[in-house]
């Protein structure tokens, strides 16, 4: 009996540990919003397809004949395409009804973040670059008689089903998406009198929420990996939207970087992502204020600081890190990458210096001050590039910050990227171009909404927008297929992720610069509220802190000046500029 009890205890322990650290992850069933296409309009091969958009109890029954009827023969493969209304991290549960023949039936299921992707097969459409990398998006499975089968998880909005077996009848009762996500409350909110900006904010927040799985991923279709540089916009979005309820998940992601890549390894094999890791630690600390956690990171931080220092010329101050990287669009230009890395090193040491101040490590403070002074001796040409100009402004490396901001304005959308677009808008704000930043957000991120996006993308090359077809429709003849025909580098064609967390910058920008709220003391014990409405008439929202929710409403006075009204919980001091 004791042995049995011990075994039960061990099983319970194992089951408990399997879910430890992710109790907030839930699954909800989602019904398709529409049947977009069927292979047959006559009813001979596909009949009653709209049944799939009706509510379903989740249980098949022997007397339930309310089914979609699919038949295939040698001349026709019965197929249909369904739309779940929004992109999500999900699998499918497919229910088959009762039929005379009780043999399993073979079907093919194809996911798509776009209509084009769902209608593409790897074997047939290789030029469009559909792929099963990182997560399967094309399955051949068997459906049981009077039962259900499930498919694996990925990121998608659309799903195509093909009946592969010939001369059989499939009674398809229902197809539901199993939406898997962290059921966090939106503690941070944003609303203004511009609905386009409201939609951009909520889409940015939702994009990150979908990527908050066992860890914080870059994308729910691909790569489903923890990229420590991509995490910077994601962490800032998490802090401004989900707040304290998600801090443990941020710890888990950051710890993955330091424990998974012990020094002298660079995190993710990319030096710049190790630099971002230090910046991420400081950013998180300002929102969370967890000093014991930060102190525990000191040995790694100090070791990493010295590792970076070894890659700086002691006379000229020139960074000489091999394998520098900003984002993919700038990667072919080594001059731009070097300029950006020079600025990023300064930002890193500035973050490390502040960490030293708060942890009482004066030696770290002095070392970082020395390295920052050395790096400022070298100001490389940045080719007036948007990404490098942005980092020059944010790091203080600019000789003339207004000129660097003007580079961003002059380059327009053609040099924006979904990752570094946040830093471009922040650089515009730092130099007083608040309305320009709002216009850029509306134009660049809004373009994705105009093309049918429900999450923001890994990349958007803006020059293709004008003639592009929507991702939630069949692309008309003569229109540019923004998914299949676009992309570059590691995201060519349909490999491009359409739900990428690094694209969430507007959620940060609108909270930090329109509502105007930022922490200026660790743990948000003191916050600064400096709103900039631009051409907006009002904005309101909430901001999460460890002490509770801050409520902010911003209006304009008779002179057009932004006037904030703030309700803060006990323990949060509010200062204004």
Annotated model-derived regions:
Residues 347, 384-389, 405-406, 415-420:
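Long, ordered, helix-rich scaffold segments
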Residues 24, 44-45, 118, 370, ...:
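Non-catalytic C-terminal accessory modules of carbohydrate-active enzymes
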Residues 401-410:
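Alpha-helical repeat scaffolds
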Residues 412-451:
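Repeat-solenoid scaffold signature
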Residues 21-214, 230, 244-249, 254, ...:
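Extracellular/oxidizing-compartment recognition motifs
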Residues 21-109, 354-379, 433, 520-577:
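Beta-rich accessory regions
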Residues 1-21:
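Bacterial Sec-dependent N-terminal signal peptides
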Residues 117, 158, 169-170, 174-203, ...:
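Active-site acid/base region of carbohydrate-active enzymes
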């Amino acid at each position: 009996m004791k042995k049995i009890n011990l075994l039960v205890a061990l099983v319970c322990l194992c089951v408990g540990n399997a879910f430890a650290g992710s109790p907030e992850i839930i699954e909800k069933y989602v019904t398709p919003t529409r049947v977009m296409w069927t292979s047959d309009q006559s009813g001979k091969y596909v009949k009653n397809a709209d049944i799939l958009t009706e509510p379903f109890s989740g249980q098949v029954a022997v007397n339930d004949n309310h089914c979609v009827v699919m038949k295939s023969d040698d001349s026709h493969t019965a197929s249909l395409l369904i739309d779940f209304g929004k992109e999500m991290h999900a699998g499918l549960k497919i229910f088959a009804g009762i039929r005379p023949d009780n043999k399993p039936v073979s079907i093919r299921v194809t996911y798509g973040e776009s209509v084009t992707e769902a209608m593409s097969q790897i074997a047939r459409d290789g030029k469009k670059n559909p792929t099963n990398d990182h997560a399967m998006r094309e399955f051949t499975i068997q459906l049981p008689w009077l039962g259900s089968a499930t498919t694996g998880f990925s990121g998608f909005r659309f799903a195509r089903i093909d009946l592969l077996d010939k001369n059989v009848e499939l009674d398809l009762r229902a197809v539901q998406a199993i939406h898997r996500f962290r059921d966090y409350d939106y503690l941070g909110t944003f609303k203004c009198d511009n609905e386009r900006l409201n939609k951009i904010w909520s889409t940015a927040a939702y994009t990150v929420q979908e990527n908050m799985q066992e860890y914080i991923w870059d994308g729910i279709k691909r790569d489903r990996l923890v990229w420590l540089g991509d995490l910077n916009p994601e962490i800032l979005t998490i802090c401004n939207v989900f707040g304290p309820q998600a801090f443990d998940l941020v710890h888990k992601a950051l710890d993955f970087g330091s424990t998974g890549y012990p020094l002298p390894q660079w995190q993710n094999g990319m030096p710049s992502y190790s630099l971002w890791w230090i910046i991420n630690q400081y950013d998180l600390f300002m929102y969370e204020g967890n000093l014991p956690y930060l102190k525990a990171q000191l040995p790694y931080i100090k070791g990493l600081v010295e590792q970076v220092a070894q890659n700086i010329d002691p006379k000229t101050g020139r960074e000489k890190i091999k394998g520098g990287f900003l984002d993919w669009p700038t990667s072919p230009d080594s001059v731009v990458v070097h300029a950006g890395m020079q600025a990023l090193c300064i930002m890193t040491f500035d973050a490390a210096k502040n960490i030293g101040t708060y942890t009482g490590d004066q030696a770290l403070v002095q070392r970082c001050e020395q390295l920052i002074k050395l790096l400022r001796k070298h100001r490389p040409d940045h080719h007036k590039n948007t990404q490098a100009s942005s980092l020059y402004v944010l790091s203080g490396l600019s000789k003339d910050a207004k000129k660097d901001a003007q580079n961003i304005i002059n380059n327009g959308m053609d040099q924006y990227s979904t990752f570094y677009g946040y830093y471009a808008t922040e650089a515009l704000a730092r130099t007083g171009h608040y309305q320009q930043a709002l216009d850029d957000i509306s134009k660049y991120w809004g373009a994705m909404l105009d093309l049918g996006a429900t999450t923001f993308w890994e990349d958007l090359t803006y020059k293709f927008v004008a003639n592009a077809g929507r991702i939630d429709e069949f692309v008309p003849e003569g229109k540019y297929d923004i998914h299949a025909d676009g992309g570059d580098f590691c995201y060519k064609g349909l490999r491009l992720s359409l739900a990428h967390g690094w694209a969430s910058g507007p959620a940060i920008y609108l909270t930090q610069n329109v509502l105007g709220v930022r922490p200026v003391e660790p743990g948000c014990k003191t916050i600064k509220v400096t709103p900039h409405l631009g051409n907006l008439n009002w904005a309101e929202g909430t901001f999460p802190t460890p002490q509770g929710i801050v409520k902010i409403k911003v209006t304009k006075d008779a002179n057009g000046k932004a006037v904030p009204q703030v309700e803060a919980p006990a323990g949060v001091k509010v200062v204004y500029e």
